[in-house]
Amino acid sequence: MDQPSGRSFMQVLCEKYSPENFPYRRGPGVGVHVPATPQGSPMKDRLNLPSVLVLNSCGITCAGDEREIAAFCAHVSELDLSDNKLQDWHEVSKIVSNVPQLEFLNLSSNPLSLSVLERTCAGSFSGVRKLVLNNSKASWETVHTILQELPELEELFLCLNDYETVSCPSVCCHSLKLLHITDNNLQDWTEIRKLGVMFPSLDTLVLANNHLNAIEEPADSLARLFPNLRSISLHKSGLQSWEDIDKLNSFPKLEEVRLLGIPLLQPYTTEERRKLVVARLPSVSKLNGSVVTDGEREDSERFFIRYYVDVPQEEVPFRYHELITKYGKLEPLAEVDLRPQSSAKVEVHFNDQVEEMSIRLDQTVAELKKQLKTLVQLPTSSMLLYYFDHEAPFGPEEMKYSSRALHSFGIRDGDKIFVESKTK
């Protein structure tokens, strides 16, 4: 069903949070009393508003009465206006300027690229710490204006905005700690490096689903560009070289990396991918969302040495030599056949006779008795069988259950089977 068009923020607010749709809550619920209004006003005498308002996909195009917004929203700290029809920044400003406690604002999927954001409008956002502009097609000029007027902005979401380039403002933003800029088309490192210039305090950079093809930057320059970067996501980027992975070591504070779905790792098995990456990134404590334990790191580094042990010296990565210094040269792991043994050579003892024979371990005790019938000259019903493990400290074990498979005894070459007669 299509959303009605031309609706105001206040109209939707009153409808959604009326007592009929949003019953009064005790405790943290906030009851807002509104003075009597002219006849025909959609406002109720009393609304119950939480501090987090979710008004997404409501067809909102404008603010409505600003006095009413101020009366209702003085306590509101989070506001989700995503997927509405707001296309004028002035209308957004009318809403936000009357929500003095606002810290989180989501304007995703509103057609705001159709208007210019003036600094006077952006100034009404000054207290916002987290701003979401996904799929808003916000221009870099708009982003620059926001950065100038939001001195406390810590988290910015610019996903799905069709960016192919990055434009730097005249002044950098020191407050921003987290930037989500996924699902754009930022292929060249020359564009990504601008983000380091713009946001020198950046802690988390999420670049997933861009097509970045290489990290073309000297190691010392990387450290200066992103001195505080702790976490980076390169999920589904276009990286194709191990040199690009090695360059991540140049970020002095990097602890967390996401690298799933990149062309470089496609030829490797799941085990090889993780171990080879862990071994190359000694400072990373979390890879693809999973903690790297000390035990996993040592296993990965030893695996790395063995993986490259037979590679020509000119092709061996530098990290290999570092790990050789740490662990020394390691011999290849012995290949152990873990398949169950199918037969065993055992000694069969009966009276004073000893006969060496090969027995199938997939047969049952009853079938073994049939095999021994000719040798010991006893009917199967008169046989008592005992199994003796030549390496075990215990005595013989009676093989009393006819349907039990021989492999369940753990029979190996050199073990003994004793046969006695029940009539003995």
Curated annotation (Swiss-Prot):
Record flagged with keyword Phosphoprotein: yes
Xref: CDD domains: Ubl_TBCEL
Transmembrane region(s): none
LRR repeat windows: 73-98, 99-123, 124-147, 152-173, 175-196, 201-222, 228-249
Localization of this protein: Cytoplasm, Cytoskeleton
Coiled coil feature spans: 349-375
Origin: domain of life: Eukaryota
Pfam families cross-referenced by the UniProt entry: LRR_9 (PF14580), Ubiquitin_2 (PF14560)
Name by which UniProt lists this protein: Tubulin-specific chaperone cofactor E-like protein
Organism this protein belongs to: Mus musculus
